[in-house]
Amino acid sequence: MPARRCIDDILAETRARLRRVEPEAAAELAAGGGLLVDIRPVELRRRDGEIPGARIVDRNVLQWRLDPTSPSRLPGVDESVYRRPVILFCDEGYASSLAADDLQRLGLEGATDLIGGFQAWRRAGLPVTPPPTGQNAAF
């Protein structure tokens, strides 16, 4: 049986291996050809909005969508994804750290995550597409 571990220790070990980025740096990387990937649940995207240009990928299929050898990969995902920055974000930057580590294990050496997640991006005043309102609102 594997030894018991707490998630905080696993998260700290994972983050020590990543070159995590602040919101402004993530925006610069995306403008320079990096790939921003939103792994938040649909409910949070509907509540808070989205980052323009970010690819939306459910966390449970992330590896298949960003693996260039997978028949289930996203359109446009090719061998270049192994070398380019891939910046994942969740709501506050926890799940995205673990997800970036999974992508690095696939060989995506530029995989990392956004420190503070979507909430930090929004607090930094970077562009956000607002959530729908009125009849088009999800709630």
Where in this protein do the model-derived segments appear?
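Rhodanese-like catalytic fold shared by cysteine-dependent sulfurtransferases
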Residues: 1-35, 42-85, 94-139
